[in-house]
Amino acid sequence: MSRRKNIKKRPIPPDPVYNSYLINMTIRRVMRSGKKSLASNIIYDALKTVGERTGRDPLEVFEQAVKNATPLVEVKARRVGGATYQVPMEVRPGRGTTLALRWLIQFSRSRSGRTMAGKLANEIMDAANETGGAIKKREETHRMAEANKAFAHYRY
Protein backbone atom coordinates (compact mmCIF):
# COMPACT_ATOMS: atom_id res chain seq x y z
CA MET A 1 0.00 0.00 0.00
CA SER A 2 1.06 3.54 -0.65
CA ARG A 3 2.50 5.39 2.33
CA ARG A 4 1.90 8.73 0.68
CA LYS A 5 -1.46 10.05 -0.41
CA ASN A 6 -4.41 8.03 -1.63
CA ILE A 7 -4.46 7.41 -5.35
CA LYS A 8 -7.23 8.94 -7.41
CA LYS A 9 -9.85 6.51 -8.63
CA ARG A 10 -9.95 6.46 -12.41
CA PRO A 11 -13.41 7.10 -13.84
CA ILE A 12 -14.77 4.28 -16.02
CA PRO A 13 -16.47 5.44 -19.20
CA PRO A 14 -19.96 4.09 -19.94
CA ASP A 15 -20.27 1.40 -22.60
CA PRO A 16 -21.08 2.60 -26.14
CA VAL A 17 -24.25 0.54 -26.75
CA TYR A 18 -26.33 0.98 -23.56
CA ASN A 19 -24.46 4.05 -22.23
CA SER A 20 -24.24 2.33 -18.83
CA TYR A 21 -21.35 2.24 -16.35
CA LEU A 22 -22.68 -1.02 -14.93
CA ILE A 23 -22.43 -2.79 -18.30
CA ASN A 24 -18.84 -1.58 -18.74
CA MET A 25 -17.94 -2.83 -15.25
CA THR A 26 -19.43 -6.21 -16.16
CA ILE A 27 -17.54 -6.36 -19.46
CA ARG A 28 -14.30 -5.77 -17.56
CA ARG A 29 -15.15 -8.56 -15.09
CA VAL A 30 -16.01 -11.07 -17.85
CA MET A 31 -12.86 -10.23 -19.84
CA ARG A 32 -10.03 -12.75 -19.75
CA SER A 33 -6.48 -12.28 -21.09
CA GLY A 34 -7.28 -8.77 -22.35
CA LYS A 35 -9.89 -9.93 -24.87
CA LYS A 36 -12.32 -7.09 -24.34
CA SER A 37 -14.17 -7.36 -27.66
CA LEU A 38 -14.98 -11.01 -26.92
CA ALA A 39 -16.19 -10.07 -23.43
CA SER A 40 -18.39 -7.27 -24.78
CA ASN A 41 -19.87 -9.64 -27.40
CA ILE A 42 -20.73 -12.10 -24.61
CA ILE A 43 -22.44 -9.37 -22.54
CA TYR A 44 -24.38 -7.89 -25.47
CA ASP A 45 -25.52 -11.35 -26.63
CA ALA A 46 -26.63 -12.19 -23.09
CA LEU A 47 -28.57 -8.91 -22.79
CA LYS A 48 -30.18 -9.47 -26.20
CA THR A 49 -31.30 -12.93 -25.04
CA VAL A 50 -32.67 -11.45 -21.80
CA GLY A 51 -34.62 -8.86 -23.80
CA GLU A 52 -36.09 -11.50 -26.12
CA ARG A 53 -37.08 -13.89 -23.33
CA THR A 54 -38.53 -11.37 -20.88
CA GLY A 55 -40.00 -8.87 -23.31
CA ARG A 56 -38.69 -6.06 -21.10
CA ASP A 57 -35.79 -3.63 -21.45
CA PRO A 58 -32.65 -5.78 -20.92
CA LEU A 59 -30.81 -2.97 -19.11
CA GLU A 60 -33.70 -2.67 -16.61
CA VAL A 61 -33.67 -6.44 -15.99
CA PHE A 62 -29.88 -6.40 -15.56
CA GLU A 63 -29.98 -3.48 -13.10
CA GLN A 64 -32.71 -5.26 -11.12
CA ALA A 65 -30.59 -8.44 -11.06
CA VAL A 66 -27.55 -6.54 -9.76
CA LYS A 67 -29.69 -4.75 -7.15
CA ASN A 68 -31.15 -8.07 -5.96
CA ALA A 69 -27.69 -9.70 -5.75
CA THR A 70 -26.07 -6.78 -3.87
CA PRO A 71 -25.30 -7.65 -0.22
CA LEU A 72 -25.98 -5.15 2.57
CA VAL A 73 -23.68 -6.74 5.17
CA GLU A 74 -20.68 -9.06 5.04
CA VAL A 75 -18.33 -10.62 7.57
CA LYS A 76 -14.63 -9.80 7.85
CA ALA A 77 -12.09 -11.75 9.88
CA ARG A 78 -10.71 -9.77 12.82
CA ARG A 79 -8.01 -11.15 15.10
CA VAL A 80 -8.43 -10.28 18.77
CA GLY A 81 -6.06 -11.76 21.34
CA GLY A 82 -5.29 -15.01 19.56
CA ALA A 83 -8.86 -15.65 18.44
CA THR A 84 -10.23 -14.81 15.01
CA TYR A 85 -13.77 -13.46 14.96
CA GLN A 86 -16.03 -13.07 11.96
CA VAL A 87 -17.13 -9.45 12.42
CA PRO A 88 -20.22 -8.26 10.51
CA MET A 89 -19.62 -5.05 8.57
CA GLU A 90 -21.86 -2.90 6.40
CA VAL A 91 -20.97 -3.03 2.71
CA ARG A 92 -20.20 0.25 0.94
CA PRO A 93 -22.30 0.79 -2.22
CA GLY A 94 -19.36 0.44 -4.63
CA ARG A 95 -18.17 -2.78 -3.01
CA GLY A 96 -21.72 -4.15 -2.94
CA THR A 97 -22.08 -3.65 -6.70
CA THR A 98 -18.66 -5.19 -7.30
CA LEU A 99 -19.55 -8.26 -5.22
CA ALA A 100 -22.89 -8.64 -7.01
CA LEU A 101 -21.22 -8.54 -10.45
CA ARG A 102 -18.50 -10.94 -9.30
CA TRP A 103 -21.07 -13.43 -8.01
CA LEU A 104 -23.27 -13.16 -11.13
CA ILE A 105 -20.28 -13.95 -13.36
CA GLN A 106 -18.89 -16.65 -11.05
CA PHE A 107 -22.18 -18.55 -10.91
CA SER A 108 -22.74 -18.04 -14.65
CA ARG A 109 -19.41 -19.73 -15.36
CA SER A 110 -20.23 -22.67 -13.10
CA ARG A 111 -23.65 -23.26 -14.74
CA SER A 112 -24.14 -26.02 -17.27
CA GLY A 113 -24.78 -24.92 -20.82
CA ARG A 114 -23.15 -24.29 -24.16
CA THR A 115 -22.25 -20.62 -24.37
CA MET A 116 -21.20 -18.12 -21.73
CA ALA A 117 -23.73 -15.63 -23.14
CA GLY A 118 -26.57 -18.12 -22.58
CA LYS A 119 -25.40 -19.01 -19.08
CA LEU A 120 -25.02 -15.34 -18.15
CA ALA A 121 -28.48 -14.54 -19.55
CA ASN A 122 -30.01 -17.32 -17.42
CA GLU A 123 -28.19 -16.13 -14.29
CA ILE A 124 -29.30 -12.51 -14.89
CA MET A 125 -32.94 -13.56 -15.32
CA ASP A 126 -32.75 -15.78 -12.22
CA ALA A 127 -31.23 -12.96 -10.15
CA ALA A 128 -33.91 -10.55 -11.38
CA ASN A 129 -36.51 -13.08 -10.16
CA GLU A 130 -34.79 -13.49 -6.74
CA THR A 131 -33.45 -17.00 -7.49
CA GLY A 132 -30.11 -18.38 -8.71
CA GLY A 133 -26.60 -18.80 -7.35
CA ALA A 134 -25.79 -15.12 -6.82
CA ILE A 135 -28.94 -14.59 -4.72
CA LYS A 136 -28.16 -17.74 -2.71
CA LYS A 137 -24.67 -16.37 -2.04
CA ARG A 138 -26.09 -13.02 -0.87
CA GLU A 139 -28.51 -14.81 1.48
CA GLU A 140 -25.66 -16.94 2.83
CA THR A 141 -23.57 -13.80 3.44
CA HIS A 142 -26.47 -12.16 5.29
CA ARG A 143 -26.99 -15.33 7.39
CA MET A 144 -23.29 -15.36 8.35
CA ALA A 145 -23.51 -11.71 9.42
CA GLU A 146 -26.69 -12.39 11.42
CA ALA A 147 -25.09 -15.40 13.16
CA ASN A 148 -22.04 -13.34 14.14
CA LYS A 149 -23.96 -10.25 15.28
CA ALA A 150 -22.54 -10.74 18.79
CA PHE A 151 -19.09 -9.70 17.51
CA ALA A 152 -20.34 -6.45 15.94
CA HIS A 153 -18.65 -4.42 18.71
CA TYR A 154 -15.24 -5.50 17.31
CA ARG A 155 -15.95 -3.39 14.22
CA TYR A 156 -12.99 -1.34 13.00
Swiss-Prot record:
Record's function text: One of the primary rRNA binding proteins, it binds directly to 16S rRNA where it nucleates assembly of the head domain of the 30S subunit. Is located at the subunit interface close to the decoding center, probably blocks exit of the E-site tRNA.
Annotated PROSITE patterns: RIBOSOMAL_S7 (PS00052)
Keyword rRNA-binding: yes
One annotated GO biological process: translation
Recorded family membership: Belongs to the universal ribosomal protein uS7 family.
Self-association and partners: Part of the 30S ribosomal subunit. Contacts proteins S9 and S11.
Record-linked CDD domains: uS7_Chloroplast
GO cellular component terms given for this protein: small ribosomal subunit
Protein name listed in UniProt: Small ribosomal subunit protein uS7
Chain ranges passing through the membrane: none
An annotated Gene Ontology molecular function: tRNA binding
Key words, A-Z: Ribonucleoprotein, Ribosomal protein, RNA-binding, rRNA-binding, tRNA-binding
Keyword Ribonucleoprotein: yes
Species whose genome carries this gene: Gloeothece citriformis (strain PCC 7424)
Gene name of the encoded protein: rpsG
Lineage: Bacteria, Bacillati, Cyanobacteriota, Cyanophyceae, Oscillatoriophycideae
A Pfam short name: Ribosomal_S7
